[in-house]
Amino acid sequence: TLGDPMADFSYLLIGWVIPATLRNGLGGADLEALGIPSIEETVERYAAAAGVAGPKNLDWLFAYNLFRLAAICQGIAGRVRDGTAASSHARTMAAQVQPLADAAWGFAKKAGA
Protein backbone atom coordinates (compact mmCIF):
# COMPACT_ATOMS: atom_id res chain seq x y z
CA THR A 1 0.00 0.00 0.00
CA LEU A 2 1.00 3.60 -0.42
CA GLY A 3 0.95 5.94 2.51
CA ASP A 4 2.97 8.38 4.50
CA PRO A 5 6.39 6.80 5.17
CA MET A 6 6.50 8.66 8.49
CA ALA A 7 3.41 6.75 9.63
CA ASP A 8 5.31 3.51 9.08
CA PHE A 9 8.53 4.83 10.61
CA SER A 10 6.70 6.14 13.68
CA TYR A 11 5.07 2.71 14.09
CA LEU A 12 8.58 1.36 14.58
CA LEU A 13 9.35 4.16 17.05
CA ILE A 14 6.40 3.50 19.37
CA GLY A 15 8.48 0.73 20.88
CA TRP A 16 10.72 3.39 22.41
CA VAL A 17 7.88 5.22 24.16
CA ILE A 18 5.63 2.49 25.52
CA PRO A 19 6.44 0.36 28.57
CA ALA A 20 7.59 -3.24 28.38
CA THR A 21 4.21 -4.31 29.75
CA LEU A 22 2.54 -2.93 26.62
CA ARG A 23 3.46 -4.71 23.38
CA ASN A 24 7.06 -5.31 24.51
CA GLY A 25 7.89 -1.62 24.62
CA LEU A 26 11.27 -0.20 25.57
CA GLY A 27 9.97 2.71 27.66
CA GLY A 28 12.00 2.94 30.85
CA ALA A 29 14.67 0.51 29.65
CA ASP A 30 18.37 1.36 29.82
CA LEU A 31 18.83 1.57 26.07
CA GLU A 32 22.54 2.26 26.24
CA ALA A 33 23.15 -0.84 28.35
CA LEU A 34 21.10 -2.85 25.85
CA GLY A 35 23.03 -1.46 22.90
CA ILE A 36 19.90 0.14 21.44
CA PRO A 37 20.15 3.66 20.01
CA SER A 38 17.99 6.39 21.51
CA ILE A 39 14.86 7.47 19.70
CA GLU A 40 16.65 10.67 18.68
CA GLU A 41 19.58 8.70 17.24
CA THR A 42 17.18 6.40 15.42
CA VAL A 43 15.34 9.36 13.88
CA GLU A 44 18.66 10.93 12.83
CA ARG A 45 19.86 7.67 11.26
CA TYR A 46 16.59 7.17 9.38
CA ALA A 47 16.55 10.73 8.10
CA ALA A 48 20.15 10.49 6.92
CA ALA A 49 19.66 7.12 5.24
CA ALA A 50 16.37 8.10 3.58
CA GLY A 51 17.53 11.59 2.64
CA VAL A 52 14.52 13.19 4.30
CA ALA A 53 13.79 15.36 7.30
CA GLY A 54 12.68 13.50 10.39
CA PRO A 55 9.03 13.48 11.43
CA LYS A 56 7.70 16.89 12.43
CA ASN A 57 5.28 15.86 15.16
CA LEU A 58 5.96 12.45 16.60
CA ASP A 59 3.23 12.82 19.22
CA TRP A 60 0.52 12.93 16.52
CA LEU A 61 2.11 10.00 14.72
CA PHE A 62 2.34 8.01 17.95
CA ALA A 63 -1.32 8.77 18.69
CA TYR A 64 -2.32 7.61 15.19
CA ASN A 65 -0.39 4.37 15.39
CA LEU A 66 -1.46 3.53 18.93
CA PHE A 67 -5.14 4.16 18.12
CA ARG A 68 -4.69 2.00 15.02
CA LEU A 69 -3.13 -0.77 17.08
CA ALA A 70 -5.91 -0.47 19.68
CA ALA A 71 -8.47 -0.91 16.90
CA ILE A 72 -6.67 -4.01 15.63
CA CYS A 73 -6.63 -5.42 19.15
CA GLN A 74 -10.35 -4.63 19.48
CA GLY A 75 -10.95 -6.81 16.43
CA ILE A 76 -8.97 -9.57 18.10
CA ALA A 77 -11.05 -9.08 21.26
CA GLY A 78 -14.18 -9.63 19.17
CA ARG A 79 -12.78 -12.88 17.84
CA VAL A 80 -11.90 -13.96 21.40
CA ARG A 81 -15.47 -13.14 22.46
CA ASP A 82 -16.92 -15.06 19.51
CA GLY A 83 -14.62 -18.04 20.02
CA THR A 84 -12.99 -17.66 16.61
CA ALA A 85 -9.55 -16.38 17.65
CA ALA A 86 -6.82 -18.61 16.27
CA SER A 87 -3.74 -17.22 18.02
CA SER A 88 -2.61 -18.46 21.41
CA HIS A 89 -1.81 -14.80 22.15
CA ALA A 90 -5.29 -13.50 21.31
CA ARG A 91 -6.41 -12.96 24.92
CA THR A 92 -3.21 -11.07 25.71
CA MET A 93 -3.71 -8.86 22.66
CA ALA A 94 -7.38 -8.30 23.51
CA ALA A 95 -6.43 -7.14 27.00
CA GLN A 96 -4.27 -4.37 25.50
CA VAL A 97 -7.13 -2.44 23.88
CA GLN A 98 -7.70 0.01 26.74
CA PRO A 99 -4.02 0.56 27.64
CA LEU A 100 -3.21 1.22 23.97
CA ALA A 101 -6.16 3.60 23.61
CA ASP A 102 -5.12 5.39 26.81
CA ALA A 103 -1.54 5.74 25.56
CA ALA A 104 -2.83 7.01 22.21
CA TRP A 105 -5.02 9.60 23.90
CA GLY A 106 -2.07 10.73 26.02
CA PHE A 107 -0.02 11.38 22.89
CA ALA A 108 -2.97 13.07 21.17
CA LYS A 109 -3.30 15.46 24.13
CA LYS A 110 0.45 16.17 24.07
CA ALA A 111 0.08 16.98 20.37
CA GLY A 112 -2.69 19.49 21.06
CA ALA A 113 -5.96 17.54 20.86
What are these regions (language model features)?
Residues 71-113:
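Regulatory N- and C-terminal appendages and interdomain linkers associated
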Residues 1-3:
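Activation segment
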Residues 6-50, 65-83:
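Active-site activation/catalytic loop segments of kinase-like enzymes and analogous catalytic loops
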Residues 22-25, 55-56, 89:
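Short, hydrophobic secondary-structure boundary micro-motifs
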Residues 53-65:
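All-alpha amphipathic helical-bundle segments outside canonical DNA-binding/catalytic cores
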